[in-house]
Amino acid sequence: MRASIKSAPVLCALFSTALFSSVTWACEQPASVCFQNNEGLPLIKDGQPLPIIVSPSADPAVKRVADAFSLDIQRVGGTRADISQAQSLSQPAVIIGVLGEDTVIDELVQKGKLDVSHIKGQWEAYQIAVVKDPAPGVAQALVVVGADRRGAIFGTFAISEQIGVSPWYWFADVPTEQKNNVYITAGSMQDQPKVRYRGIFINDEDPALKGWAQKKFGGVNADMYERMFDLILRLKGNYIWPAMWGKAFHLDDPKNTALADNMGMVMGTSHHEPMTRAHAEWHRKSENPAGGGPWNYETNRENIQKFWRGGIERMMSKGNGKPYESLVTVGMRGDGDEPMSEDTATELLEKVVEDQRAIIADVTGKPAAETPQVWALYKEVQDYYDKGMTVPDDVTLLFADDNWGLVRRLPTKNVDREGGFGVYYHFDYVGVPRNYKWTNTVQIGKVWQQMDLSYARGAKDLWVVNVGDLKPIEFPIDFFLTMAWDPEKMDTQALQEYANNFAKQSFGTGLANEIGDLLQRYGTFAAMRKPELLNQHTFSVGEISAPKLKAGEFYQHYVKWQKLEADMQKVKAKTEPEHYPAFFQLVEWPIASMSNLYEMYFAAAWNQKLVDAGDARANYFKKIVEKNFAKDKALTDKYHSINDGKWDGMINQVHMNYVTWNDPDQQTMPTVSAIHSAKNDIDVAFEESPLPPSTQIIQAADYIKASDNDEMEWTKVEHLGQAKAGVVILPQGSGPTSIDDNVSLTYELTQPYYGDATFTIELSPTLDTYARGGIRIAVAIDDRPAETLSFDLHATGGAQHTPEQKAWAQAVINNKHSLQWNVQDLKKGSHKLTVYRIDDNVVLEKLKIEFEQKAEPEAESEFAVSRFFSKLFGSN
């Protein structure tokens, strides 16, 4: 029977980055950190900390977090807290333990001094309380009690975060501000997660993370994972799919398995690695002396079953009939994360899972349902599910995005099934239409929209995100795991404040808003198009003219990146030296490297165009390209040398001049040429062309009227999509509405002359998560009947054959999808355009209207009327 994860009353969930509070506000909240003496419990007084008490019989994970907390106190106050295993209180102290497993805490509960009714039996719940008179002669004590071992961990790290220790203190070198006095206010607070399993997938880790780990730790080993597990737990995550490119977590370092369990982590294996077995193990002689044979369940069933049994036996090798805590992946894909044969029947996959569950039951000695399991509906496996594949009720069904951040399918039935549902999401990917592995290209607004929808539709049991090398995707990882802890708290206001709060935690209050703005703008710009998809042909470059060049779309992107980099440099100049290593990693390098890449391709495009025209200005752009190519290497070298080379090798992904979906072998500069007979000091300038009168652009957020209903309302969400703001209906997850329901937005437009109009409605791309044949909206002009428009993008992991697959590929390449609608015979003047909601998961970004003038029908013209009366009454 699983521990309950139902919501317990929460007095004050203060301890997350998204809700990071001001000191004044925190001092008014119960059981909260305060840096002013408000008669609270002094955690640190004049640099001296309270001792920490932990039970001698405590779980190793609880002892480890007590030790980590002692070090965190030292980071803040300068002195490490003493750790005691005393079974009674003789002075004020910090008591860390698990309900029912800690003598001191249990006695406080029995004496009525600590009410734990809100967390008892709740999955990973914790309570932080200042207890008065906990023992004779002791005025007060700070109790951190977990309903289970991870509850105790999360409660302890919650305090660490609020006293100023960032979860990224090691993985991004975020410094800790020194405090001589730290107090905990009176009272009690509780918190617990809304999503059961919350984790990351380390993937596509060659050459970056692998090369870095080899230099830093001697390999992807327990020393590296100890740092990574610490980060995940501080971010209130509990789950990981470990690195798997040629790696085997349980074999590569004998210490890995026990380390994960001793730190409180839940181990898993990726979507195509069943029964706790890494894919690499199948081909290792130590596990398969005969080499394993073909990964084909129809022809090699006996060997595969032996292999799987070995995985479950290893999971149960902890002793005393207890497993190393795991979430067991079931199911099967082809060898090397490929689809199984095209004629694979649904019945075979059902048989695979049936046999796997029989092995689980046999090895554990318990019904299979008592071992947590997950079946990933990834790529073609989702198709089998759509066609009726039967899945045991206790197995968590893990839906997936399309590898580009668009969730493919969500629950439509049995939402309350025992195993529940989850989502596998991507911040990194290797596959069509192009790999993206180099840098952070995540817009957290899009993550919020897709995961908020997923949660609303019932995906509440597992959220796991592919993070590639982990760096440099720190900010989106922080957001994803914070949201996973409590999606209900991550409303649009919390979303908009998130970047500023992350910056405040990382760099202090002074520059928080400026850095937050840089992070938001970067996320929006970078998400528009993956850098691996950029080249000199990506955007229209403009036209050759004199004395100034006529700018095209490429110039607009170049300018906004240059402005962002200039703004970053201004903030950098105000950054304190102790914050600079973190600033470089989290802010400067991402912005400078992407700005540099855009400038390089922009210059390469103009060089090519001007050389073809024999224009000497080509030489200016040739120099720019060469400068940019050198700067890219210099930025990489600086990243690898900062903090005495701590991150050497981490930013080694090839990211220039892709030709196919897969990455090139090495960095190459775009081809440039010179006009040798020309001067090299020619000035270059640009002029932008105004929007023609025949074109009007309206931001989706600039509606003149929003018609809601009692259950849903239109909401503007900044930094969602590429426009001023994305406009969505909240709450998400509701069923269809009709045109008669009039859940709509109204826009005003001006037709410059009589004629026709072509409307282009730009949307943030989304997928039909119901498999109902597409997503619909309706549009109407003035009082004319509404027309329904729809789109149905079909994600594919291979070649795009159908129109729907080709449309999907273009949508993820450009990070937008457009619908077109033609309207005939509009009179000159003002008109009202109405956009109606029909289906969920629509994000409106922008409206573009192109007008085409034509002759007004004679019967309606003034000339026609005059001629009619002339004929009727006669004229000379």
What are these regions (language model features)?
Residues 233, 238-241, 247, 399-405, ...:
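Structured mid-domain segments that build the active-site/substrate or prosthetic-cofactor binding neighborhood
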Residues 27-192, 753:
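Contiguous, structured surface segment used for ligand recognition
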Residues 168-218, 223-243, 419-422, 694-697:
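An acidic-aromatic substrate-binding cleft motif
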Residues 175-183, 251-254, 259-262, 294-418, ...:
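Gly/Pro-rich turn-and-neighbor structural signature
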Residues 11-21:
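Bacterial N-terminal signal peptides
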Residues 176-179, 499-655, 743-745:
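C-terminal non-catalytic alpha-helical accessory regions
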Residues 198-208, 215-220, 231-234, 261-263, ...:
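Aromatic- and acidic-residue-enriched carbohydrate-binding clefts of CAZyme catalytic domains
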Residues 663-876:
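Extracytoplasmic
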